Amino acid sequence: MRWTPPPASTAIRRASSDGQSPAVWYIAGVSDENRFEEPLERLRVRIAELGQNPESPARDKAIRKLSARLEKISAEIYSNLTPWQKTLVARHPARPFTLDYVRVLLRDFVELHGDRTYADDPAIVAGFGVLGERTVAVVGHQKGRDTKEKIRRNFGMPRPEGYRKALRVMKLAEKFRRPVLTFIDTPGAYPGIESEERGVSEAIAVNLLEMSRLGVPIVATVTGEGGSGGALGIGVTDVILMLEHSVYSVISPEGCAAILWKDQARAREAAEAMRMTAADCKALGVADEVIPEPPGGAHSNPLATIDAVGRALVRHLDRLSSLPTETLLEARYAKFRRLGAWEGTAASR
């Protein structure tokens, strides 16, 4: 498998404020909100440093000891994350993005560009490739890693042409009877004036309609943030998978706190109330399956994460591909009709 690691987002540096006090270890790139990750980053960097030393029994023993400690602490921390901490993990810049899944899982991938109406949108990647022995269409949000790419990808926030490009590729998949895979990881659709002028709400609405009746299997995977309509625009699918530490919500916790309490500092409280974690979404019937992440999150072992997602995708495609189109569409309709239904309402019957 091929995996291109992102530029180091964290690094431990030695600093001394007065030249006399002992050197202080600090982690560059870890915000105060993300301090729960700090012990893990220290251990990872120490293991990497030891790995650069000449081979010796003592070095190997030290690496094994630190690795065991890292695994233990990772399991302890990540099994007790709050919804707000899971939100921060979902936004981690080293988590695999759509193109990382494409590079590892697919062969002969051909990316298609443009919506044939206005322009291309780099915030959404779309094309065709081969998963196992099956040709599939892939549509997914793509965030950037460095500043230049983040700007080019618009931080993973699609404009209307991105959703129209996505639909163009999905309609091609339907024409050639190929299943569709979508990868969701966005803070939301871009809300700028030019986006509104070109009809972002209409573009998303059309995608919801067309995906609801697309005559081929569709599987979505929420790999990081599932942000509001920006996620839904490629999220009307037969199966919705969520990585363990991904989130799916109608608005960000910060946005919710700003609207309800006029105070973004209450984002932690909002995250608790919104029930946006993968476990919550599974319990509510929004997600069909939660894919476990390695101890320490997807960013700690991207290849293992991508492999787990690939296995789940193949399993669901095998099942969905055996269904008649009419059965597939009826089940898709029933799935979304049940969402938000309470006992006693017509939709719950």
Placement of each model-derived feature along the sequence:
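Glycine-rich beta-alpha loop segments
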Residues: 108, 120, 126, 131-183, ...
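Terminal peptide-recognition signature
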Residues: 43, 82, 138, 185, ...
